[in-house]
């Protein structure tokens, strides 16, 4: 029985144990499955392999390392961002500590507000490349009063402080009495504009404008948009280049008045002349400065919107300006001649004057504007200058005048030499204005007979040939008009207007466009004169608009003497000394009101005939031939 059981167990064990052939087949089958799995390489197999690796201890370790690397990369990026934010916040805090407006705030400001305040503070400091405080001006061993007296003594003027908002005189030194003859108490608290010349008020208001000084540092909350009240301690005031001021103005002088009788014409003119001279030219130089209202001791309760605003004032020194008279140069030293530029209308009136004219002529630019240059020419030089005036209106070339005398403010004459050229509008082809560069001619140059400065001698073609002289004879004495210095004549300003009307009339009579007159827009010598049968030709032959020759010399002037064309018949009034503006207006038939009405009636008749509302048109009333 026992043997039987042993045989059965050995048979079962033999059956259960694989043979060599079975082992080979099983190993091949397993390797084939693995090869097929590697050969497919699909995402599903990779995921299954990863899932299989998770079950395997070695696979789980690799998966954990992979997840750890991803987590470490994320933590490193967040750390970098955190360090960047911390660094930016530290810079913002440091910037806020450097800006005074941010440092004075009680609460912490957001980044945008800090950056905006920093930009505003840098704009405030712009232009002050070398800022310095008031303390750097004064040495330590000098007091304020001593320094003030030294400055006034060196400047030979007076110190004044004027508010920029209303022009109120806040302070003036006692030395103002030496210049304006006003005491210190008379001016303090008064308006500066009450003591200025009416033509200079606008200029001084422009100089008192504080738009280009340091801007007001008014803070605005970024969240609410409302102004923020700050407790900023005012630091020492700074001066920047944009706050500098230097200008000329005329101020009243408290001179003792002279009692005159109004009935006397000469006394009345003398009074007007004295009134003109009651103003003196003051050269003011200084700075615009700002002070807090509390420091100035001003009451600001009436202005609720005045918080954070500073009071802007002009602190300047006024000095009496005296015009420069050219002195003869001794020796061979050559210096640059003094000159100024002026611009004139076609009739000779000043429309622009360079500021350098004040130092030469003693006139302020606003005194010359609107006046005719002929009012300042010497009567012996008007004939030559009138001829140059015609030439500059007829040609595009530069015209250089001879030496002539120009009346300055004190009544004396200064010798000038000018270069004129006309500016033509490129669209309308008309002369708009004349530019004149005026150079001072020194006395030693005239005495030495410099050939580059020809001088015009007295000739019959002077003031007498340009203005009516009456019927008493060809020559008469010049009347002396009270208030007008000798050497000039009353009514000389109309000469420029007459010359301009003459050139315009000739151009209108010719009826040609400016571009068809050759090289000159108003050339009257390049084309033949009109027919004498026409109204324009009769007018020219009668002496109303004489022909101007292209060549000629001044009477009594040699051939080699440099000069400009001039002829007896070229004068406006050479043949008819009694002609005037009213005579020219009466002779211009085409521009009278009656002719204008006739022309308008003909035009209306043409319109009615064209529309079928009237009969035939009668052209007999036309003021010009058809």
Curated annotation (Swiss-Prot):
- Keyword Transmembrane helix carried by entry: no
User: Which region ranges are annotated with the description Interaction with CIART?
Assistant: 508-588
Q: Where is this cross-link: Glycyl lysine isopeptide (Lys-Gly) (interchain with G-Cter in SUMO2)?
A: 259
Task: List localization entries.
Answer: Nucleus; Cytoplasm; Nucleus, PML body
Q: Where is this region: Disordered?
A: 1-58, 459-492, 511-595
Motif, Nuclear export signal 1: chain positions? 142-152
Q: Where's the Glycyl lysine isopeptide (Lys-Gly) (interchain with G-Cter in SUMO2 and SUMO3) crosslink?
A: 252
Kindly list the residues the record flags as site (Important for interaction with CLOCK): 125
Residue numbers bearing the Phosphoserine modification: 17, 78, 90
Q: Where is this cross-link: Glycyl lysine isopeptide (Lys-Gly) (interchain with G-Cter in SUMO)?
A: 259
Q: Which PANTHER family match?
A: CIRCADIAN PROTEIN CLOCK/ARNT/BMAL/PAS
- Identify this protein by name: Basic helix-loop-helix ARNT-like protein 1
The UniProt gene name for this protein comes to BMAL1
């Amino acid at each position: 029985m026992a043997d039987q059981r042993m045989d059965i167990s050995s048979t079962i064990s033999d059956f259960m144990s694989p043979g060599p052939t079975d082992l080979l087949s099983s190993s091949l089958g397993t390797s084939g499955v693995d090869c097929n799995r590697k050969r497919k390489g699909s995402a599903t197999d990779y995921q299954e392999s990863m899932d299989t690796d998770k079950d395997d201890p070695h696979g789980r370790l690799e998966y954990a390392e992979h997840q750890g690397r991803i987590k470490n990369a994320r933590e490193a990026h967040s750390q970098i961002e955190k360090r960047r934010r911390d660094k930016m916040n530290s810079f913002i805090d440091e910037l806020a500590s450097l800006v005074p407006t941010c440092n004075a705030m009680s609460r912490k400001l957001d980044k945008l507000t800090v950056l905006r305040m920093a930009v505003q503070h840098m704009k405030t400091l712009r232009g002050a490349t070398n800022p310095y405080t008031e303390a750097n001006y004064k040495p330590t061993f000098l007091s304020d009063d001593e320094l003030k007296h030294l400055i006034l003594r060196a400047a030979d003027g007076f110190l004044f402080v004027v508010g920029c908002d209303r022009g109120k005189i806040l302070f003036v030194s006692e030395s103002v009495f030496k210049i304006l003859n006003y005491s210190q108490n008379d001016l303090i608290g008064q308006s500066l504009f009450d003591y200025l010349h009416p033509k200079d008020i606008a200029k001084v208001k422009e100089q008192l404008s504080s738009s280009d000084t340091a801007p007001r540092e008014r803070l605005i909350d970024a969240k609410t948009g409302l102004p923020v009240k700050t407790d900023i301690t005012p630091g020492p005031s700074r001066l920047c280049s944009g706050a500098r001021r230097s200008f000329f103005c005329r101020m009243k002088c408290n001179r003792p008045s002279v009692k005159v009788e109004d009935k006397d014409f000469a006394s009345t003119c003398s009074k007007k002349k004295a009134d003109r001279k009651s103003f003196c030219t003051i050269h003011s130089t200084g700075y615009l400065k700002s002070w807090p209202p509390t420091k100035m001791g001003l009451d600001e309760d009436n202005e609720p919107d005045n918080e954070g605003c500073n009071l802007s004032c002009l602190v300047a020194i006024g000095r009496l300006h005296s015009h420069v008279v050219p002195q003869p140069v001794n020796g061979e030293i050559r210096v640059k001649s003094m000159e100024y530029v002026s611009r004139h209308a076609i009739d000779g009136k000043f429309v622009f004057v360079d500021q350098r004219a004040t130092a030469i002529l003693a006139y302020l630019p606003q005194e010359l504007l609107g006046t005719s240059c002929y009012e300042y020419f010497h009567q012996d030089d008007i004939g030559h200058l009138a001829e140059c005036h015609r030439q500059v209106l007829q040609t595009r070339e530069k015209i250089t005048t001879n030496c002539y005398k120009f009346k300055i403010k004190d009544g004396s004459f200064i010798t000038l030499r000018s270069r004129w050229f006309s500016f033509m509008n490129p669209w309308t082809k008309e002369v708009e204005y004349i530019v004149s560069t005026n150079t001072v001619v020194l006395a030693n140059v005239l005495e030495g007979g410099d050939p580059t400065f020809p001088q015009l001698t007295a000739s019959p073609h002077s003031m007498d040939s340009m203005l009516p002289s009456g019927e008493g004879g060809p020559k008469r004495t010049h009347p002396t008009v009270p208030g007008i210095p000798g050497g000039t004549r009353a009514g000389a300003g109309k000469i420029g207007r007459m010359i301009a009307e003459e050139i315009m009339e000739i151009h209108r009579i010719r009826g040609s466009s400016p571009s068809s007159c050759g090289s000159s827009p108003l050339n009257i010598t390049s084309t033949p004169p009109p027919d004498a049968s026409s109204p324009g030709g009769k007018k020219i032959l009668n002496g109303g608009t004489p022909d101007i020759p292209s060549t000629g010399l001044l009477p009594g002037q040699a051939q080699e003497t440099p000069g400009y064309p001039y002829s007896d018949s070229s004068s406006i009034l050479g043949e008819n000394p009694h002609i005037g503006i009213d005579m020219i207006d009466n002779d211009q038939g085409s521009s009278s009101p009656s002719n204008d009405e006739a022309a308008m009636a003909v035009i209306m008749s043409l319109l009615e005939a064209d529309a079928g509302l009237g009969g035939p048109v009668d052209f007999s009333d036309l003021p010009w031939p058809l």
